[in-house]
Each structure stands twice: as structure tokens, then as C-alpha cells.
């Protein structure tokens, strides 16, 4: 299995990209890597070139560039070349920590959509915070690929999320929920009410109804489906709340006197465990589901651990054949039309 890597994408590239790739290479003997980037910057960072191949590129797409224009103009950029390698069958998957919009555009216009998918959805794995939960994470999409969605898009996301949860997370018959402003059936705008009816009518989906943003991290669903605008806003609010709580805790320890500092020392292992559980580096990257091959992006500030874990995630996708199974399902749109519940 070969992964095309954008070695130049990310705030700390190419150093952390190379470090993470080498850690993954040492862990998985069945993986090979093509590193797309500037050889003068990439080669000195490689400790062992076993199963690593540098593919020279002369251009980079920066974080601030307009995505579609960039991939059209910078044909020799690391993002475009890596995505093209996947399209041409020279690699099995594409990984980057670079410009999110450019990665999405390259995935959509170069790698291409699966037949039957109208709009691919950006899919993240989020932690479950509920103590004693049977699972530690869940699938969340669309987290920002599409600001506006139609009923059919969210229906497709439910199936994409189902296949991903089954094959990558190993969840049998995953519970699927719709992100909404209330748990009741009649909540939401016209779009969400219609999507609720559609998902509830499918006998091959384990639809458990609406879920509110406040319940996202409490293990009530294995797959949460939403339009990109709502899902991204809820995700950012959750991240902001977590940061605020950590800031308040640190401030309380710093200004709380000796007793607070002693309490912190006693609870330090607990804080470390919580930090690991909530860290984005633990859960890999965001997948643009609905494409003909794995296209996976990790956050721009990713460290080597995040890179390694994202590559592990890609490997699982390749080994389980989740894309092939998704293609097989969507190859005939009759699958969606014929999956109505018996009334």
C-alpha cells in the first residue's frame, strides 16, 4: 500500500511530516510513501529512506491562498502532484496537513467523486467523554466541506458515516443521529424535518433520531450527520468551551494559593489523561468521504504523533476496503431508493 504525502503542507512542515511518516513506516511494514515536496528541504530530514521516495515539486500552496485558483495555477505543487498520483493509480491514498480548501478542491476535482455521491463530506472522529461508555469515539460529518446542503446530501452522509464506522471503527450496526436544535421529532427547520423523515424511513440505517450539540460528546450516537455549516459551528463552539475550561482551571491553580497547587500535583495524572483523550493528535485526520480514494487531512499545527495516527487511520481504510464497499453500494442509486422501511 502506497500513500502520497504532501510533505510541504502544515505549519511545521516538512519536519513533523517526515518524523510522523518515519514513525508510521517503522510501525507498518506494509506501507510505502511517496513524499511530494522540495528535495532540498525534505531529504536532510530523512533518517532512513527505507520505503520512502522523494518526488520533487517546485511549488507550494500556502495556507492563505484561494483554493480552486491555487490548484489550477500551481500544477507542480505538492498537493496537486500527490492528488494526481492517486488519480493515476500511482498511490492508494493522499495525505496532507496543508491548506484545507486546496485539499478539498484537489480531492473533488482531481481524485474525483464516487458515482452516486453529489457532495463529499468532511468527516472527523471525535472523542466520547462519557465515563464508562462502550466506545471512545464517534463519526461526525459534514464538518465543513459544504456550507449548504440538501436532503439528499445528508442522506448520503448517513450511509457514508455508517460504512466508515463499521469498517474503520469496527462498530456493528452503528447508531446514526441527526444534529438538530432539539431531540424531538418535530424540531428544526424544513431541511432537518425532511431529513429526519428520510433517515427514519430507511430499514438499513439504525437511525436513533435527533441529537443536540450539548450531547455530542456523550456517546448517544456512533455517527452524527449534519450540514457543514451547522456541524462546523457546533465543533468550533465545543473546542472553544474546552479551551475556556482549561484556561479557567489553569488560572485557578495559578492564583489559588498553596492548596490549589498541591491539589494540582495530586491530580496531574488525571489532567494528563484527559488531555490525551481530548487531543486532536490522538484521533487522526479528517477524511473527505465520498471520493474514489482516501483523501485525509490533519490539522495544520499537527505534530508527529498526529501525522503517525492519521497514517494509521489511512492504513485501516485501505486494509478494510471501506472505499470499495462504499463504491459498490452507491454504484446503483437504487440502493437508496429501495431501502424504505416496510410500513
From Swiss-Prot:
<dbReference type="Pfam" id="PF02504">
    <property type="entry name" value="FA_synthesis"/>
</dbReference>
<dbReference type="GO" id="GO:0006633">
    <property type="term" value="P:fatty acid biosynthetic process"/>
</dbReference>
<comment type="pathway">
    <text>Lipid metabolism; phospholipid metabolism.</text>
</comment>
<keyword id="KW-1208">Phospholipid metabolism</keyword>
<dbReference type="InterPro" id="IPR012281">
    <property type="entry name" value="Phospholipid_synth_PlsX-like"/>
</dbReference>
<protein>
    <recommendedName>
        <fullName>Phosphate acyltransferase</fullName>
        <ecNumber>2.3.1.274</ecNumber>
    </recommendedName>
</protein>
<keyword id="KW-0594">Phospholipid biosynthesis</keyword>
<dbReference type="InterPro" id="IPR003664">
    <property type="entry name" value="FA_synthesis"/>
</dbReference>
<keyword id="KW-0808">Transferase</keyword>
<dbReference type="GO" id="GO:0005737">
    <property type="term" value="C:cytoplasm"/>
</dbReference>
<dbReference type="GO" id="GO:0043811">
    <property type="term" value="F:phosphate:acyl-[acyl carrier protein] acyltransferase activity"/>
</dbReference>
<keyword id="KW-0444">Lipid biosynthesis</keyword>
<dbReference type="GO" id="GO:0008654">
    <property type="term" value="P:phospholipid biosynthetic process"/>
</dbReference>
<keyword id="KW-0443">Lipid metabolism</keyword>
<comment type="similarity">
    <text>Belongs to the PlsX family.</text>
</comment>
<keyword id="KW-0963">Cytoplasm</keyword>
<comment type="function">
    <text>Catalyzes the reversible formation of acyl-phosphate (acyl-PO(4)) from acyl-[acyl-carrier-protein] (acyl-ACP). This enzyme utilizes acyl-ACP as fatty acyl donor, but not acyl-CoA.</text>
</comment>
<comment type="subunit">
    <text>Homodimer. Probably interacts with PlsY.</text>
</comment>
Amino acid at each position: 500500500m502506497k500513500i502520497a504525502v504532501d510533505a510541504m503542507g502544515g505549519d511545521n512542515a516538512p519536519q513533523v511530516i517526515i518524523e510522523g511518516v518515519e514513525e508510521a513506516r517503522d510501525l507498518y511494514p506494509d506501507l510505502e510513501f511517496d513524499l511530494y515536496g522540495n528535495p532540498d528541504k525534505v531529504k536532510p530530514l530523512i533518517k532512513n529512506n527505507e520505503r520512502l521516495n522523494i518526488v520533487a515539486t517546485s511549488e507550494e500552496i500556502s495556507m492563505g491562498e484561494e483554493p480552486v485558483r491555487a490548484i489550477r495555477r500551481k500544477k507542480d505543487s505538492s498537493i496537486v502532484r500527490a492528488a494526481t498520483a492517486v488519480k493515476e493509480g500511482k498511490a492508494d491514498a493522499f495525505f496532507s496537513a496543508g491548506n484545507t480548501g486546496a485539499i478539498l478542491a484537489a480531492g473533488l476535482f482531481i481524485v474525483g467523486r464516487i458515482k452516486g455521491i453529489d457532495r463529499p463530506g468532511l468527516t472527523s472522529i471525535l472523542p466520547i467523554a462519557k465515563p464508562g461508555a462502550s466506545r471512545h469515539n464517534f463519526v461526525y460529518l459534514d464538518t465543513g466541506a459544504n456550507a449548504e446542503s440538501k436532503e439528499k446530501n445528508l442522506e448520503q452522509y448517513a450511509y457514508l458515516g455508517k460504512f466508515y464506522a463499521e469498517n474503520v471503527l469496527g462498530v456493528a450496526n452503528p447508531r446514526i443521529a441527526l444534529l438538530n436544535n432539539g431531540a424531538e421529532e418535530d424540531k428544526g427547520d424544513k431541511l432537518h424535518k425532511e431529513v429526519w423523515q428520510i433517515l427514519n424511513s430507511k430499514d438499513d440505517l439504525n437511525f436513533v433520531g435527533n441529537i443536540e450539540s450539548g450531547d455530542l460528546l456523550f456517546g448517544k450516537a456512533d455517527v452524527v450527520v449534519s450540514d457543514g455549516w451547522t456541524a462546523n459551528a457546533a465543533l468550533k463552539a465545543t473546542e472553544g468551551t474546552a479551551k475556556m475550561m482549561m484556561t479557567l482551571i489553569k488560572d485557578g491553580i495559578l492564583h489559588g494559593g498553596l492548596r490549589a497547587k498541591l491539589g494540582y500535583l495530586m491530580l496531574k495524572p488525571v489532567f494528563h489523561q484527559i488531555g490525551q483523550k481530548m487531543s486532536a493528535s490522538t484521533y487522526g485526520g479528517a477524511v473527505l468521504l465520498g471520493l474514489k480514494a482516501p483523501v485525509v487531512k490533519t490539522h495544520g499545527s499537527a505534530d508527529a504523533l498526529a501525522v503517525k495516527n492519521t497514517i494509521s487511520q489511512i492504513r485501516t481504510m485501505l486494509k478494510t476496503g471501506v472505499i470499495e464497499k462504499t463504491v459498490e453500494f452507491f454504484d446503483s442509486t437504487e440502493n437508496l431508493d429501495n431501502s424504505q422501511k416496510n410500513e
